[in-house]
Amino acid sequence: MPLKPLALSLQWGRFDAAAAQRSALPRHLIRRWIRHALTTDAEITVRIVGADEGRQLNRTYRNKDYATNVLTFVYSQAPLVTADLLLCAPVIEREAQQQGKHLQAHYAHMLVHGTLHAQGWDHEGSADADAMQARETQIMQALGFADPYARQPG
């Protein structure tokens, strides 16, 4: 299946490890990971933030007083997906370490996950969660990554 066109805007919040994260996440990889998850044309802004901004936005928009790995804000879906994906760098880094995953692999997974949300996928019920996880695994493996839901050794 051909990759869909993507207008990508990439923003970096102010946080301690922003420079290191930026060098580990070149724009062309972010674009590639998102495009593999798209089934329609898209305009997506990716903003990578620190814990304070991530917590504030999660509290404001989801009434949850903690920073989470990815938030998806959808403005339109087919025929053109328009969305913002907010990734919280410290949460993603901590999760990657805890799960024994390479940092880029976990970022790719969170971008795929958020992009699927932008297209209407969710994981509210167990059937939806199973379907979404299967799709994420398929995309991640097509990108050359391991199944993100496989148990890590150790």
Curated annotation (Swiss-Prot):
Gene Ontology biological process: rRNA processing
InterPro entries (UniProt xref): MetalPrtase_cat_dom_sf_prd, YbeY, YbeY_CS
UniProt-listed PROSITE patterns: UPF0054
Pfam families cross-referenced by the UniProt entry: YbeY
Annotated organism of origin: Verminephrobacter eiseniae (strain EF01-2)
Domain of life: Bacteria
Sorted UniProt keywords: Cytoplasm, Endonuclease, Hydrolase, Metal-binding, Nuclease, Ribosome biogenesis, rRNA processing, Zinc
GO molecular function, a single term: zinc ion binding
Transmembrane parts of this sequence: none
PANTHER family linked: ENDORIBONUCLEASE YBEY, CHLOROPLASTIC (PTHR46986:SF1)
Its EC number(s): 3.1.-.-
Subcellular location: Cytoplasm
Residues engaged in binding Zn(2+): 113, 117, 123
Class of this enzyme: hydrolase
Name listed for the protein in its UniProt record: Endoribonuclease YbeY
Record-stated family: Belongs to the endoribonuclease YbeY family.
Cysteine disulfide partners in this protein: none
Co-factor(s): Zn(2+)
Function: Single strand-specific metallo-endoribonuclease involved in late-stage 70S ribosome quality control and in maturation of the 3' terminus of the 16S rRNA.
Co-factor: note: Binds 1 zinc ion.
GO annotation, cellular component aspect: cytoplasm
Keyword Transmembrane helix among record annotations: no
Coiled coil (residue ranges): none
